[in-house]
Amino acid sequence: MEGVGAVRFWLVVCGCLAFPPRAESVCPERCDCQHPQHLLCTNRGLRAVPKTSSLPSPQDVLTYSLGGNFITNITAFDFHRLGQLRRLDLQYNQIRSLHPKTFEKLSRLEELYLGNNLLQALVPGTLAPLRKLRILYANGNEIGRLSRGSFEGLESLVKLRLDGNVLGALPDAVFAPLGNLLYLHLESNRIRFLGKNAFSQLGKLRFLNLSANELQPSLRHAATFVPLRSLSTLILSANSLQHLGPRVFQHLPRLGLLSLSGNQLTHLAPEAFWGLEALRELRLEGNRLNQLPLTLLEPLHSLEALDLSGNELSALHPATFGHQGRLRELSLRDNALSALSGDIFAASPALYRLDLDGNGWTCDCRLRGLKRWMGNWHSQGRLLTVFVQCRHPPALRGKYLDYLDDQLLQNGSCVDPSPSPTAGSRQWPLPTSSEEGMTPPAGLSQELPLQPQPQPQQRGRLLPGVAWGGAAKELVGNRSALRLSRRGPGPHQGPSAAAPGSAPQSLDLHEKPGRGRHTRANLSQTEPTPTSEPASGTPSARDSWQRAAKQRLASEQQESAVQSVSGVGLPPLVSDPCDFNKFILCNLTVEAVSANSASVRWAVREHRSPRPQGGARFRLLFDRFGQQPKFQRFVYLPERSDSATLHELRGDTPYLVCVEGVLGGRVCPVAPRDHCAGLVTLPEAGGRGGVDYQLLTLVLLAVNALLVLLALAAWGSRWLRRKLRARRKGGAPVHVRHMYSTRRPLRSMGTGVSADFSGFQSHRPRTTVCALSEADLIEFPCDRFMDSTGGGTSGSLRREDHLLQRFAD
């Protein structure tokens, strides 16, 4: 057996030698090495680069993070054992210098972050070993000068950040070694001068940011940007530019975004943007422009967004945006504009976002064309809400143009800046019946139409159930019909406000086709006969005819205003779903409820819908009350629906039902809280009834009360038991208290000792027989018994003295 045990022992020893314990990796002090390829030493309070000699395999480290420490110097041996390193982060330290051989062994490094340190220069040759470097961050340092050797060897560099330094100039060919550079950040420096060849060899550059520098007041030399054939984004904002020379960007055929905001530009050459056919976004906000040359935007055929806010523009030529057919967003807010032509945006059919707020608008006849264009575009759903708030005249201060009545725009002696219609489409008003002797000038009777034709975009669809008379059908094209807005209804002018002297200067009936109310009947009455002699040969006759026409038009406008105030006219034209929910949709009621279905009905006020959008549809939203998230179920209903029945509902369950309008496939982003109704389905017949929550609540309350009573009873019984036990201990019989009284002599008490301990067994241990305690008086006879049996007289006397001292009064 001993031989077998020895054999087993040696086998165990050999097994332990064959499989030695794996050596644990030793991580540098204050660092984290949980991932074998990532050495994390960020925000550890380090003042020097930790030694990596303790790492078992430093060649496996691919990422080394040292950001957020207090490192001031990088030596030549800090990274010499990390030959496979791909990413090195040294940001937010206090590095002042780099040893020329710091990166000598990091030939595979792809990302180097040196931002937010105290570097004052990039010594030529320091970065040369980094042949595979693709990203270099040197932002937030104190670099004041660059040389061509600073980036020698960085042929693979794609992104370079030098922003937040103190660079004062860019020498020629400073970025020449960076042939593959795509992104260059030079913002927030002190660059005053751009060399003629500063960006040479950067033919692949796509992004260049030169904002927040101190560039010279005039940017005139186009040769600076000649090498940047692939540039798509150029940011020159927040400089001190005051003037742009002609064709300064002509060598940037792929430029898509140009930002010149926050400068001091007061003048732009008419050919400043020549050659920018691909430009999609132009930002000129925050300058001092007071006018735009007519041909300034002509080359920008692809322009989609233009920001001219925060300038000093007081007027714009009607043809300023005549070549911007793709323009979608335009901001003219916070300028000094008082009027705009109605045709200034006619060449931009894609325009849907227009900001005109913050100008000093004068609401008179010069804004009639703009109001008409806004109404047409908004009715077709092609334009978001435009806020044009009147500042002048004082009577209209604070009012919004889009809901002002045309009668309120007759003030002042002004001429509509919108171009007059062509001769073929011009329509003249006719004199009254009392002035039959006056005839229009020769040739005008043949141009007079029989009936005013409404514009195609104004012909709306009428909902069923709305009665429309013949006169209303002829007035479908009324441009001045009420249009609802989120700001509520606009002011109306009484009939007394329309006077013959306030008639408009223009005689074009297309401006207010609904005011004249010309029908075939009254046109036939006022049309001059062919036998009438024309009186238009002399200027006096022509002037008298025009005065009569103005009086006739004023009277018709007065009559139309009276009718509009009295409620006679067309229903409102609604294209916004939020306005539809607020003003048109009403009275959602629950008609019938069963165990598994419910019927709801709603009402729709009279209105018109634009032709491109079609009639209003409805969306019904319903869900069990209190469920999160709300409205998991909704149903789209067809046009002309005013009721719906919900099926497959759960019996005896509360539901919340809401309805909202759908116009042109769009719904209001605001929840339809104003058109909701609650219902509770009936219990299912013959089925098991649902839970009675009231009864369940009462039962639970009763059970809780019973539990509280039981707890109180248990506590009371325990307290009562304690009281009784204490009373029993304190109320012993008189003869017992008299027996153990300390006032009696000890001799009289010794007579009962033999009787009390007559059953004493001498073979039991002494400690078992008498468990002594100094706090118990019953120990006394037991002590005397033990002393009397083996102690003698002297022991008894000593104990008596002790007890006398202890129990003396």
UniProtKB/Swiss-Prot annotation:
What are the Low complexity biased-composition ranges?
488-506, 554-563
- GO BP field: inflammatory response; innate immune response; regulation of cytokine production involved in immune response; toll-like receptor 4 signaling pathway
Intervals, Extracellular compartment: 26-694
What does the UniProt entry say about where the protein is found? Answer: Membrane
Instruction: Supply the InterPro entries for this chain.
Output: Dev_Immune_Receptor (IPR050328), FN3_dom (IPR003961), FN3_sf (IPR036116), Leu-rich_rpt (IPR001611), Leu-rich_rpt_typical-subtyp (IPR003591), LRR_dom_sf (IPR032675)
Provide an example Pfam family for this protein. Answer: LRR_8
This entry's comment on induction and repression of expression is: By bacterial lipopolysaccharides (LPS) (in vivo and in vitro).
The residues that the database entry marks as glycosylated are 73, 411, 587
Which of UniProt's keywords are assigned here? Glycoprotein, Immunity, Inflammatory response, Innate immunity, Leucine-rich repeat, Membrane, Phosphoprotein, Repeat, Signal, Transmembrane, Transmembrane helix
Q: How is it modified after translation?
A: N-glycolysaled.
The residues covered by the LRRCT domain are 359-416
Q: Where is this region: Disordered?
A: 412-462, 483-563
What ranges does the record list as Polar residues composition bias? Answer: 421-436, 521-543
Show me the LRR repeat boundaries. 61-81, 84-105, 108-129, 132-153, 156-177, 180-201, 204-223, 230-251, 254-275, 278-298, 302-323, 326-347
Q: Membrane-spanning regions, if any? A: 695-715
- LRRNT domain location: 26-57
**Subunit:** Belongs to the lipopolysaccharide (LPS) receptor, a multi-protein complex containing at least CD14, MD-2 and TLR4. Interacts with TLR4; this interaction is greatly enhanced by LPS stimulation. Interacts with LPS.
Quote the function comment for this protein: Component of the TLR4 signaling complex. Mediates the innate immune response to bacterial lipopolysaccharide (LPS) leading to cytokine secretion.
What is the protein's name according to its record?
TLR4 interactor with leucine rich repeats
Taxonomic path: Eukaryota, Metazoa, Chordata, Craniata, Vertebrata
